[in-house]
Amino acid sequence: MSNTEKNLPTKYDHMSVEEGLYQWWLEGKYFEATGDEKKQPYTIVIPPPNVTGKLHLGHAWDTTLQDILTRTKRMQGYDVLWLPGMDHAGIATQAKVEGKLREEGISRYDLGREKFLEKAWEWKEEYASHIRQQWGKVGLGLDYSRERFTLDKGLSDAVNKVFVQLYEKGLIYRGEYIINWDPATRTALSDIEVIHKEVQGAFYHMNYPLTDGSGHIRLATTRPETMLGDTAVAVHPEDDRYKHLIGKTVTLPIVGREIPIIADEYVEKDFGTGVVKITPAHDPNDFEVGNRHDLPRILVMNEDGSMNEKAGKYNGMDRFECRKALVKDLQEAGVLVEIEPHMHSVGHSERSGAVVEPYLSTQWFVKMAPLAEKAIELQQKEEEKVTFVPDRFENTYLRWMENIHDWCISRQLWWGHRIPAWYHKETGEVYVGTEAPADIENWNQDNDVLDTWFSSALWPFSTLGWPNEDAADFKRYYSTDALVTGYDIIFFWVSRMIFQGLEFTGERPFKDVLIHGLVRDEQGRKMSKSLGNGIDPMDVIEKYGADAMRFFLSTGSAPGQDLRFSMEKVESTWNFINKIWNASRFVLMNMDDMKFEEIDLTGEKSVADKWILTRLNETIESVTRNMDKYEFGEAGRSLYNFIWDDFCDWYIEMAKLPLYGEDEAAKKTTRSILSYVLDQTMRLLHPFMPFVTEKIWQHLPHEGESITVAAWPTVREDLQDTEAAAEMHLLVDIIRSVRNIRAEVNTPMSKKVQMQIKAKDEAVLAQLTKNSSYIERFCNPSELTIQTDLQAPEKAMTAIVTGAELFLPLADLINLDEERARLEKELEKFDKEVERVQKKLSNQGFVAKAPAAVIEGERAKEQDYLEKREAVRQRLADLEK
């Protein structure tokens, strides 16, 4: 692709810059892991998006961070594998496919299981193609030769093997439990698929009569229809109000069933009346109480949310119709004494919107305690543990693991990994295996499929060839180096990958977990359909380009924090890229057909040359260090400041002096430095902005085919010159101060004015005299005087910089009162700085713990501020004369 044109197009057009580049990268196989044994492997597996539709901004953010990591590591010489893939997303995909069928007037039952699954696979192929297109638009450097899908044969084999082995170890069992039940889709839901909403409900206060006729006991419920399944009433064992009733019975209203009054510490004495109804088949807490007291479990609902025969005369009614009818009957019977309005949180199915029912069901479960124990123990081993970034999320993870419940893994769906369990048609015997029974005609396979998170938990190793532990990719690329994901799925996904990885590979599945937050709108609200504040990343790319979106997403927040999305800030990033483009055009137009081998940094350098090379070194160090710490925002800020301020605003302007001069050697050195600095900067920026950096780099004198595989910049000690950097800082301070003064008195830079500089000592005088051409070029003085023994002229505007004082005699333009006010403001600023640094230096803890270089730096600051403050005081005194 190498482009020999020296000029970039006049205007930056993100669409033309980004067009075709991704396909060119893919054709060059730059993203494919090589297996080169001379290189150290670096692996990331992409968190697989659901094959349910479009990727959102959260995906764009998450994958951009991974792309930054993998592009950086590839340039640093690693054998990088970034493995792509997608998740079948059980209930989410099935709901979409069923919705599409409903539009055609068909249900999945009309089609039957096999035909329905064919439709689901068609959906998968269509949407997988959309997702790949979106990945390409974002510019993700994925190794498509290794793309995986959670229902691939290899991954399905891994799922079956894990299920069977856990079953054989007694860690998978089948039993009754209260699960989240969606009556609309008729399946169990994981907690993450339940959305809690505040709804207006009521407390229904009822009197349950004591069977012996001695009175009644009052309680309240928000779900009166479940009382039909009550099997006890509970009070706290230490509640003096009810101690005498423990062991007695009440008669369940309407039903007439006699149920016991039991004592259990689950009851809160101070909440309500201190009495609760116990319905073990319809409430998870009641289920636990029922187990402790050996209570019967009476299920009064069907799977579709209608009442069953156990509900007596309400049999066949919808649960909410039953509630109305039952409340009316309770009122007429004098049992219901009060209906108290009550706002409370109610779980709704994320997919169907139906109110979720806590429901007693026979399901498959993973026994979590033994698995969690190993994962907790791992975190005590410093060299082997999973490192969370930020580290506060390790506590979140451990807290969940320490309080873990058994995991319901069966789902009443068709789309997914079918549970590898069969039931004998005659004996009811259960067979679990990776292969079907030999006499399959005598067995029925379990109809349920596994929770999507079950296969996702195996993702880091199943994608690399496990259970074949001799698979080349598994041996080379496992365990992986980093996982990038949101804090909202630490429990649902991260924790499960860790315990499954430990159980089946004996290793952590990843070394580091980089946690990011959620993308919110500018007001800090979560993006949602109901608020209408969602933004399609493809729309952002169309308007401003992938590079602008990526840079904003990756630098807009610190690790673990939420990101407030702002289209205005994306536009600002586009403006930044436009500035880079224009600066690159200037550099390329002044290359004079320079070839890569002609770049020579050994010639005599100006102070500006030495300074920009030193600043480049500092930027390389800062960006590399922050990338290693996952501080992409800090790395981005270092790059932004270097490119915008140092390179574009200062060095390019200063480079015009030799470029437009007569000294050919100086021209060659300047061209070499411009080319070198722009090349190195494009490499540093490439992981953030892959498209524009490739485009510019291809126009620069370069070696190699693509910037994607160009070497990552390293600090060059031979180009480091801290003295020159200090000289340049003084020049920049002087030029900035003069510009500020001119702006204050509305004197344009084109108007020549007298300028006097009082140097602090002979060394500063020598520096300023040597570099006076820069001062003359950028300050435009009619006359420049630099001395060590200058007296401040009357009615002069003043600026104090480190090592010098500036005087601009602007007698006709100066307002003495305004100048006095300005200097007093300066004095106040230096007073605060002196106070701050002296407070720091008087802190014994700081002095005892801080490195000597840091303390020395603070003392140097103190001296500098004291000198500047004294100079301001002197100028104020002069104004009073």
From Swiss-Prot:
The answer, when asked if Cell membrane is one of the entry's keywords, is no
Fetch the SUPFAM superfamilies from UniProt: Anticodon-binding domain of a subclass of class I aminoacyl-tRNA synthetases, Nucleotidylyl transferase, tRNA-binding arm, ValRS/IleRS/LeuRS editing domain
Motif 'KMSKS' region: which residue numbers? Answer: 526-530
Which residues take part in binding ATP?
Answer: K529
In alphabetical order, the GO MF annotations are: aminoacyl-tRNA deacylase activity; ATP binding; valine-tRNA ligase activity
Enzyme's top EC category: ligase
Q: From the UniProt record, list the reaction(s) this protein catalyses.
A: tRNA(Val) + L-valine + ATP = L-valyl-tRNA(Val) + AMP + diphosphate
One GO biological process from the UniProt record? valyl-tRNA aminoacylation
Q: How does it assemble?
A: Monomer.
Protein's UniProt name: Valine--tRNA ligase
Gene from which this protein is expressed: valS
